[in-house]
Amino acid sequence: MQEELAWETDGLLPLERQLHEAARQNNVGRMQELIGRRVNTRARNHVGRVALHWAAGAGHEQAVRLLLEHEAAVDEEDAVGALTEARLCFGMNALLLSAWFGHLRILQILVNSGAKIHCESKDGLTLLHCAAQKGHVPVLAFIMEDLEDVALDHVDKLGRTAFHRAAEHGQLDALDFLVGSGCDHNVKDKEGNTALHLAAGRGHMAVLQRLVDIGLDLEEQNAEGLTALHSAAGGSHPDCVQLLLRAGSTVNALTQKNLSCLHYAALSGSEDVSRVLIHAGGCANVVDHQGASPLHLAVRHNFPALVRLLINSDSDVNAVDNRQQTPLHLAAEHAWQDIADMLLIAGVDLNLRDKQGKTALAVAVRSNHVSLVDMIIKADRFYRWEKDHPSDPSGKSLSFKQDHRQETQQLRSVLWRLASRYLQPREWKKLAYSWEFTEAHVDAIEQQWTGTRSYQEHGHRMLLIWLHGVATAGENPSKALFEGLVAIGRRDLAGWSTMARSQLTATSASRVQMILVPQPPE
């Protein structure tokens, strides 16, 4: 519900609508005029509300008294029968509305007029629930001190007491009043949540601190096995997470499904919460009931910043879930290029296969994610080269993503002319094999179909992949290209190669490396 009732007048006759409006605005003179014309004081709009609801919800004492004097039914609820629209109605009567909005004097008038004090909304909210949720301490005091047989720990349809409601909605003063009145601190709702779970999940620091001070059990689990720390992590509340950790919460507590607090932080994408948990000793490599690590979840839900944090925190990039999928398999399946680049730079094993026997490269091919296919091939070629050159300095800023920058346009144009005008349909593959592309690499490139001239695109992609490797190795691209063409028997292209050499050589090997390998973001 909102801080005031949403104005609804459908389903009313014109004069009835005017009565509702006058009650809402406390226009007693107009109300008396309309009542004198025998306008029905019990007329309902299309969501079941009567004039008394508007007057009580707005705290208009004169309007309430006038309506009660003219046959307004004190206990009428909205959302009655066929009029019910769950989106708009809550099964609230005037008494509950006065408690909800904190109008103590209206509450007293209605009680003195015979309103039933043990009423409930359709969600099972009592007067105590309404006042506690909205933090109206004077109303709470009246209910507890002046009304008879009020059950302090009565539960609503979710199994929550007024104490739960105050905690869930951050009402510290109301919470203190209920504690002082002797409420049960440890009661659980139907999902097994304590007040600690609810306050932590909503991020209410002051209430959470008070509950910790009261002595609620930090390790109490709900029906799914979540502790309050899980709730705070899942709600992306780093301050609450820190508070609970300082109070002694177990950072690596597991739910029934083996989910850690770090899993919940990963599901919500919270880098801040994850960092707090990791610094407190949270294990980055624990797996849930499906074999998924926090890194798997961060990849699946496309949280690049969190993926970077987890990788830097020694998460196992080669961990496999119950489907034998690594995080890279997931990135390949969804075409998350930024995340795939991080995993490739981290050195993920490209030979691991899922339950269908597919590598991450095969998954990318099956999903027709061309750019990601090329990234994986670049990475595979780089790590093969690196294995054979262990003494080479590794001070290169790696990236395997496709480069679209203006600085590389000339180079890419040269290679496109070669692929589209000079190489015959099968020659790009001969050139690829001469440069030690594997059969799997060639097959992966060839899966793309753009028509009868697909070979031109295949050749262009292969040349760009090759150029990435040449740049990374610090080799002379013009020399390597010339030697490759000679190796496949295309010495006749020497003239073209010589022409292109001036364009390629104009950019030194070191310059090629710099512009082909984008710098990582700061």
UniProtKB/Swiss-Prot annotation:
GO biological process: signal transduction
Gene3D superfamilies documented for this protein: Ankyrin repeat-containing domain, Death Domain, Fas
Transmembrane domains' residue ranges: none
Death domain segment(s): 413-501
Pfam families the record matches: Ank, Ank_2
Sequence ranges of the ANK repeats: 14-43, 47-76, 90-119, 123-152, 158-187, 191-220, 224-253, 257-286, 290-319, 323-352, 356-385
Matches recorded under SUPFAM superfamilies: Ankyrin repeat, DEATH domain
InterPro entries in alphabetical order: Ankyrin_rpt (IPR002110), Ankyrin_rpt-contain_sf (IPR036770), DEATH-like_dom_sf (IPR011029), Death_dom (IPR000488)
Statement: the UniProt record of this protein carries the keyword Lipoprotein: no
CDD domains xref list: Death
Keywords: ANK repeat, Repeat
Protein's name according to its UniProt entry: Ankyrin repeat and death domain-containing protein 1A
Organism: Homo sapiens
Gene name as annotated: ANKDD1A
